[in-house]
A protein has these predicted regions:
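Active-site/ligand-binding neighborhood in enzyme catalytic cores
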Residues: 115-225, 250
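FAD-binding beta-loop-beta segment adjacent to the flavin cofactor pocket
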Residues: 313-319, 371-398, 402-404
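N-terminal Rossmann-like FAD-binding beta1-loop-alpha1 element of flavoenzymes
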Residues: 2-28
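A conserved FAD-binding loop/helix module that cradles the flavin
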Residues: 400-425
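Glycine-rich FAD pyrophosphate-binding loop
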Residues: 20-44
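Conserved Rossmann-like nucleotide-cofactor binding loop
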Residues: 11, 34, 254
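Dinucleotide-binding Rossmann-like beta1-alpha1 core, especially the glycine-rich loop
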Residues: 45-129, 141
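Mid-domain catalytic core of redox enzymes
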Residues: 22, 221-337, 341-342, 346-358, ...
Length: 427
């Protein structure tokens, strides 16, 4: 069969490799000038680094397995990382039993409830019941009103704004579980990265695809999927139709109704009902580390970011210090209309709050990326809201990061969904 894949992110590349291993003919069409999607790298002041941060957890079996398949297991590195929380003007350690005991913003009963909640989340295997519950209600039931207000309310409000009350508990629970299980021992968090960054994996996938006869077409957006008799006929690129038997879309599903005008109205409506939160992600290169933490949650009403990620505290190759600062917000929020420089300036204005020693001459370089479909809004009942990957048009399949639900966004989930798409296509 001739198969066209739309999108050369990890999901599309893994799907292509699976199909090529089964002897199919595969072409991948990518709008960008490089492979990788959100995991693609850029030249940041002489340092090749990813547009958006990624990390690996101990439970990420799919990516760990893929690294083994590609002969890259020795490129996986594990780091003892630290987590922090900035609350009411003070930086606290977080993520260990000792840190919880020392945290003075909640009482002893709240601390016990918090610990029990994490232990409970670590043991959950079936998320179907929590798919019907809101995350806020779930947290308040386990932690109490005060601990929710101190530790979670600000994070929800600054990532989802008016949508913060309509998130599935399953969506949140898998995130808690993934981090809680990624430990060297009870007292030490351990997270992973790939030597050379995600580019190491992406280039290995590219090589494996091309060796098997697959073709990757960059700067080649698919303009339309042609359909005849309710069956895929071809993909139109630069005005030319390329005949194919299957089309697999791995770009945000919101693009699919435009690419495939023949989709039934009801199915297109289900796609359009899936909502996303964009991100404006500031990246800073500093002379020295801002904090000792990889991940810092910010639960402070005077700082309008939910947290920062000091990637260089995970991956020392990304030195001297690399900080990602994500601003999540709906496109309708007035702040989203600001230019990138305004977000960079706002970020820099907060740094001395997080570290009083910070000085302007620490800044070596700044950058800012935007992505419209950064975080899917997953309300209760999201399992039932997601349209099936196999569309009503024969030979047309689709998935994007919303299909990771209830799992966290990660390259590992891209691997899982990419392989699932390949199996569906061949069924």
């Amino acid at each position: 069969m001739k198969i066209a894949i739309i999108g050369a992110g990890p999901m599309g590349l893994v799907c292509a490799l699976e199909l090529l291993n089964r002897g199919e003919s595969v072409d991948i069409y990518e709008n960008d000038d490089r492979i990788g999607g959100m995991s693609a790298s850029f030249d940041f002041d002489g340092l090749p680094i990813e547009r958006f941060y990624h990390f690996i957890c101990k439970t990420d079996a799919a990516i760990i397995g893929l690294l083994g398949e590609l002969g890259l297991s020795e490129r996986l590195r594990w780091t003892d990382t630290r987590m922090g929380v900035y609350c009411d003007g003070r930086l606290y350690d977080w993520g260990t039993p000792q840190a919880l005991l020392r945290f003075d913003r909640i009482g002893w009963i709240d601390k016990a409830r918090y610990a029990l909640h994490v232990l409970h989340a670590k043991r959950i295997r079936d998320w179907s019941a929590l798919d019907k519950v809101t995350a806020v209600d779930w947290l308040k039931r386990w932690l109490g009103e005060r601990a929710y207000r101190v530790l979670w309310r600000r994070l929800f409000d600054l990532k989802f704004y008016e949508h913060s009350g309509r998130l599935s508990a399953a969506w949140l629970g898998t995130r808690i579980r993934r981090i809680a299980l990624s430990r060297r021992n009870l007292l030490q968090e351990s997270l992973g990265y790939i030597d050379g960054g995600s580019a190491t994996l992406l280039e290995a996938l590219r090589t494996a695809i091309e060796r098997r006869g697959g073709r990757i077409h960059l700067r080649s957006p698919v303009e339309r999927v042609e359909v005849a008799g309710n069956r895929v006929r071809g993909a139109v690129v630069a005005g030319v139709e390329h005949p194919c038997d299957r089309v697999i879309s791995t770009v945000p599903i919101q693009y699919v109704p435009r690419l495939v005008p023949d989709l039934p109205d009801g199915f297109a409506a289900r796609i359009r009902a899936i909502e996303n939160i964009p991100v404006v992600c500031v990246v800073l290169k500093l002379r020295r580390a801002l904090t000792p933490n990889f991940w810092l949650n910010i639960c402070d009403d005077t700082i309008d970011i939910p947290g920062i990620v000091e990637y260089s505290n995970l991956n020392p190759q990304a030195g001297p210090a690399i900080v990602y600062v994500p601003f999540y917000m709906p496109k309708t929020h007035p702040k989203f209309a600001r230019d990138n420089a305004a977000f960079v300036d706002e970020t820099i204005g907060y740094l001395s709050r997080l570290n009083p020693e910070f000085a302007a001459d620490w800044i070596l370089a700044t950058h800012c990326h935007r992505y419209e479909f950064a975080q899917t809004i997953c309300p209760p009942g999201f399992f039932d809201l997601l349209p099936p990957m196999q569309t009503p048009i024969q030979g047309l399949f689709m998935a994007d990061t919303s299909y990771y639900y209830p799992e966290d966004r990660s390259i590992s989930e891209s691997v899982t969904v990419g392989k699932t798409l390949a199996r569906l296509c061949m069924a």
